[in-house]
Swiss-Prot record:
Uppermost EC category: transferase
HAMAP family per record: Cytidyl_kinase_type1
GO molecular function, one term: CMP kinase activity
Localization per record: Cytoplasm
GO cellular component terms listed in the entry, alphabetical order: cytosol
Protein name per UniProt: Cytidylate kinase
Catalytic activity: CMP + ATP = CDP + ADP; dCMP + ATP = dCDP + ADP
Family affiliation: Belongs to the cytidylate kinase family. Type 1 subfamily.
Keyword annotations: ATP-binding, Cytoplasm, Kinase, Nucleotide-binding, Transferase
Keyword Nucleotide-binding included in the entry's annotation: yes
Principal location listed in the UniProt entry: cytoplasm
């Protein structure tokens, strides 16, 4: 079976990473969570006590930052200056920093180069905000996965509670709405639906139902049936 690249875009909390991981396991593909890269930069900025609007200081940090993606036993590890930060970058405090640094041109350029290099061999499922429109515009299958802000906040709330974080639903909802605004209005590669993307609204769908829809689209692209 020939291998293709799959781009899965959408707003924060839409379930992109969850679906991408399941799809990668099902197809034997590599999953690249590009948002994790921006979170890694956000984590370093946060730990450096730099405000997210101090662009010059962020660029200084960027020049001395090494980000690597490793695939181990089918799972993605994010290495920040040699340290595995895969779990640390999921802290709630990192989210807004990731959104803010993603608006900086030099940050996006550095990370997009890494992302494009990872996809050269095909067989990659890449999820993010600008994969189908900017990072992998030639991806053979493009999905735009979305859900209402309220549903996305609820999912994030339950996920964080399960991990032991004390979080407030309404604060999460406000943060998600702010991230949506940031992502859609940034100057470089804003969040938008690619012209050739298929939109899936997961608000009232189970994970299994979304996965089935994506699998049907995948097999249609490569000329087979589920």
């Amino acid at each position: 079976m020939k291998k293709i690249n799959i781009a899965i875009d959408g707003p924060a909390g839409a379930g992109k990473s969850t679906i991408s991981k399941l799809l990668a396991k099902k197809l034997g593909y590599i999953h690249i969570d590009t948002g994790a890269m921006y979170r890694a930069i956000g984590l370093k900025v946060l730990n450096s006590n730099i405000k997210s609007n101090e662009v010059e200081k962020i660029l200084e940090v960027l020049d001395n930052t090494d980000i690597q993606i490793k695939i181990v036993a089918g799972s993605q590890l994010v290495l920040l200056d040699g340290e595995d930060v895969t779990e640390k970058i999921r802290q709630p405090s990192v989210s807004m920093y990731a959104s803010d640094v993603s608006k900086i041109k030099e940050v996006r350029e550095k990370l997009v180069k890494i992302q494009q290099d990872l996809a050269k061999q095909k067989g990659v499922i890449m999820d993010g905000r600008d994969i189908g429109t900017y990072v992998l515009p030639d991806a053979e299958l493009k999905i735009f996965l979305t859900a209402t802000a309220e549903e996305r906040a609820k999912r994030r709330f339950l996920e964080l509670k399960e991990k032991g974080y004390e979080v407030d639903y309404y604060q999460l909802l406000d943060e998600i709405k702010q991230r949506d605004l940031n992502d859609m209005t940034r100057e470089l590669a804003p969040l938008r639906v690619a012209e050739d993307a298929i939109v899936i609204d997961s608000t009232n769908l189970t994970i299994e139902e979304v996965l089935q829809k994506v699998l049907e689209l995948f097999y249609k692209v490569i000329g087979n049936e589920v």
